[in-house]
Amino acid sequence: MSQNKLLSLLGIARRAGRLSLGNDPALEAMRNGQKCVILVANDLSKRTLKGVCFAAEEAHIDVLTMNETMDEIGAALGKRTGVIAVNDAGFANKMRTMCSETDNQQKNEEE
């Protein structure tokens, strides 16, 4: 349920022009000093994830792993991608909160 809300919020952020979709645009956003958060799909390749995490660490930006695959993200946003940069502080904070709530729910379900 919370993941559907996250995908909906991503859709709103995309329509508002606050997302950089794809590896290269996300890396460019980090290099340009845009304070953001990076969301990655759970099926992103290890090599791509390593590169994104390295760049994010240098820019002091959080990387959050979503529970969705690239195909699921693509269905929600209209573009299949595994790396999303959220370039708006308000959207980024809300997505951080939603991702942490989802992680807490999953931990409770496992126990």
Label each residue range with its predicted role.
Residues 2-40:
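N-terminal first-folded block
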Residues 6, 22, 26, 34, ...:
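Amphipathic alpha-helical interface surfaces
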Residues 11, 31, 57, 78, ...:
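Signal for well-folded cores of large energy- and translation-related assemblies
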Residues 31-53, 60-62:
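N-terminal positively charged helical leader segments and presequences
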Residues 39, 110-111:
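Ribosome-associated RNA-binding proteins
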Residues 42, 67-68, 88:
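Short secondary-structure boundary segments
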Residues 54-81:
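Mid-chain, well-packed structural core segment of small domains
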Residues 71-110:
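C-terminal structural segments of small proteins and small subunits
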